[in-house]
């Protein structure tokens, strides 16, 4: 025991990396962050205290520089950092051959689906949920905007991934296991497996019903067709997993990002007013709000980018990699040591951003802005860039523009604070918005 303590304190290759004392012996930072539900903010506190590289466990480092981001996730990252044994590896197959086969199929199929059905499915889902919530029919009736956003994004996700509308029972049960998986017991088991054995943990097969729905054009069917055209044998469970990931990416992450965007707009009425003015000039009716037009609106896209910066959906720890023996920011990381870059800390670092804690979409369109935009790259870069990036931007543009075009908003739960009242593990949840929604044009409800 004494020898082990001496090794951990003085002889371990990571012994000189700053961090909490207990992190030399146990993953105390992860335990603390999961127990408190403040992972996003705790990572930033650690980096504010110890600097740009922090030891957060016996064999885990967290970085907070854009140069570390380039090194770990950039074009050459795969040569020095592995998915094997990492948390990121838990999200999909780690088999290199399957990844090589599947990635171009997923990227191509998503882009084709986006072009063919993205806007249509988004409008259908929004119209149905606006109607079911009776939005705008009684101006004084409070509406849970966060619940409304959650439900139409769940429906859109189900249509895009598997061609069905989904139901409320499925919405609850499908993601209970994911959120439970981020609970203390499940997370510590995952950490123990990855830390002790450094072995990949393959997800079990997702149990999807065969597609018997009114939306036959969906990711699952397109992946099947693409695999058939290229004569590739892709196991069914891998097709299902990628559909599940799309579903979770839309419902499990985009809904909170959308709620965060509206939170900051409602808390900054000058930003909401400027966005209203920009969107109202797109067309004479809501039917003219095509994504081709919305993509050209600088302030709308700036609001989306600013939300990605100030309130990232995921903590960087979910993008963990395992070093094969590499140097990051002048620090040698021995083989087997896990590394990640914290997105929230990067997005709030004053060395990269002027007034980093202020919601300021103007920074993204100001030609004289001195901010370093490399410090906010929510979709990663290079070969590992998220294939759903275009779909995410389209979805946000359509949803935000349509609601802002049709309705005026008044925030009711003004005492809600996004930092104080939300829960953040590796995934940020719990943004609550109660509003009244008044039609801008009497009788024009959008459904």
From Swiss-Prot:
Catalytic activity line of the entry: 2 fonsecin B + NADPH + O2 + H(+) = aurasperone B + NADP(+) + 2 H2O; 2 rubrofusarin B + NADPH + O2 + H(+) = aurasperone A + NADP(+) + 2 H2O
Binding residues for heme: 386
Keywords assigned: Heme, Iron, Metal-binding, Monooxygenase, Oxidoreductase
Keyword Iron assigned: yes
Transmembrane intervals: none
Enzyme Commission number(s) from the entry: 1.-.-.-
Presence of keyword Lipid biosynthesis: no
Any Pfam family hit: p450
Annotated family: Belongs to the cytochrome P450 family.
UniProt-recorded name of the protein: Cytochrome P450 monooxygenase aunB
Origin species: Aspergillus niger (strain ATCC MYA-4892 / CBS 513.88 / FGSC A1513)
